[in-house]
């Protein structure tokens, strides 16, 4: 999943231009890089005319092999801003095996000062770009860049999108033959929308023939600069003599899109993220929150930890966490550092032999700029407090004030926050969903998104989802002169964060039985014991043992989790009709019945984030919007399906328990 080299290895010529050491090739023409990009990719795909012809609310999807320095993307974005109507949107999806480091990207793009107004916002958001799918939102969501970091033949088969124009870039076929294969071109054809176009800088005969065989009609056209000819073409359709692509499974299909109005039930991280992603796409959103303010339950802690609990084996959950971490980390760039969040890093202590072994596996699987091992003296120096163990350090992690993130997300002008609205019943009337609290109708819209954690089980459509509540309590301790030295979040079984507004947060307990949210002295004592295991030195610096337990401040809330620890994100189906429609799967799970899924039209969910909501909820808002808008998914298809609500009904059918 992770490239052997985390970043491109570059040499720079005497004019400051980058050259790849791995492929021994240049990133762009030394004489006319911009002119060449515009001629080969912009003009051959007729992007000026096509952007100008877009309607308000319409989107255009460009796919690219080889992001490189981002020059093609920036030129496309510049033209889109010049030609497209204000309400149109651009999706740019690009695969890159060896992404440039932020410093190298900044150095390379400095060569093009005329693109500075586009490269500057890209560079601001070019943080935490690691393996897999990485979504970067620009211009308030009008332009979305999704980078697929890794080998093209591993990433593109996982892409779910319909591409209107392909930029076939990458290094020259002779230098990088893996990017110019029949297998890769078949993926481009699978992803091509009807009428899709394609262009590339090479005019090599065998490349043209392979693209023709994949379903594109290619022709040579005059080049520019030192390139005599280039190739352009159109997608004619899947070739008749080629094996058909695997049939789409209807239970993971996309429901039809209707009117762009939505009710979001629940004003925590999941609800605010869902509302923000839809509002950025032109939706009118009503965000219903039963409390007086947003983020009053599990999303209301003063500090949450931006911490990646990864697997070395590339599981669906690990891929979700890696993509979600990057997305949230980029969103935090919009907030006030020090008060709303701090990228102080996270240190996970190797507190026993099993944890030390797990950390060693992770350090071998992931690049050092994501995580790296520190021995005990290094860890102690990094943390600024006495520690008994070394551990794994995540330099881009840190702490977040979740209510600040929620409030920023909900501040979009197309979002109306309706406080003191507790939805007790949903009714479907004349293709609209109505939210009721008894005798009073609170609001109505074409789409409802259930984002109220486990409380959504009160609604019949989501009552069978296996969501469970786990009580957690945090403790707040006043900062002291001695505790100011804590320089990073430190975790073992629990966590402690550097102070925010004069208070440290530590926690959090796990109670699977209690349904009472009154903070208890017993759990404060448990949190202090977890702090002792992290650092007895910090416990002493805080004077925590001298504080009466009944004087400690804190709060309790319910986490909401699923049995497989993945969130539940996507459209909801009618449970009984689903079991009847796909009953045959109980006899043969391999078949794909050609029967449409019995969707509950306009009913969606974003829930089950457990203790990872800071990392998974914001990107799940994007995933939900992609399902609704028929856009490129922000996650690998297998991960999106692993998060789909229908996964539980499918498992019951296949096991014969429906």
From Swiss-Prot:
Q: Name one GO cellular component term.
A: cytoplasm
Provide the alphabetized UniProt keywords. Cytoplasm, FAD, Flavoprotein, Methyltransferase, Multifunctional enzyme, Oxidoreductase, S-adenosyl-L-methionine, Transferase, tRNA processing
Keyword Mitochondrion assigned to the entry: answer is no
Q: Which top-rank group of organisms is this from? A: Bacteria
Where does this protein reside within or beyond the cell?
Cytoplasm
Annotated region (tRNA (mnm(5)s(2)U34)-methyltransferase), positions in chain: 1-236
Name a single GO biological process.
Answer: tRNA wobble uridine modification
Identify the SUPFAM superfamilies for this entry. Answer: FAD/NAD(P)-binding domain (SSF51905), S-adenosyl-L-methionine-dependent methyltransferases (SSF53335)
Indicate where this protein is primarily found: cytoplasm
Read off the NCBIfam families from this record: MnmC_Cterm, PRK01747.1-2, tRNA_MNMC2
The family database entries (PANTHER family) matched by this protein are listed as: SARCOSINE DEHYDROGENASE-RELATED, TRNA 5-METHYLAMINOMETHYL-2-THIOURIDINE BIOSYNTHESIS BIFUNCTIONAL PROTEIN MNMC
The UniProt family comment states:
In the N-terminal section; belongs to the methyltransferase superfamily. tRNA (mnm(5)s(2)U34)-methyltransferase family.
Q: What does this protein do?
A: Catalyzes the last two steps in the biosynthesis of 5-methylaminomethyl-2-thiouridine (mnm(5)s(2)U) at the wobble position (U34) in tRNA. Catalyzes the FAD-dependent demodification of cmnm(5)s(2)U34 to nm(5)s(2)U34, followed by the transfer of a methyl group from S-adenosyl-L-methionine to nm(5)s(2)U34, to form mnm(5)s(2)U34.
Q: What is this protein called?
A: tRNA 5-methylaminomethyl-2-thiouridine biosynthesis bifunctional protein MnmC
The record's gene field reads: mnmC
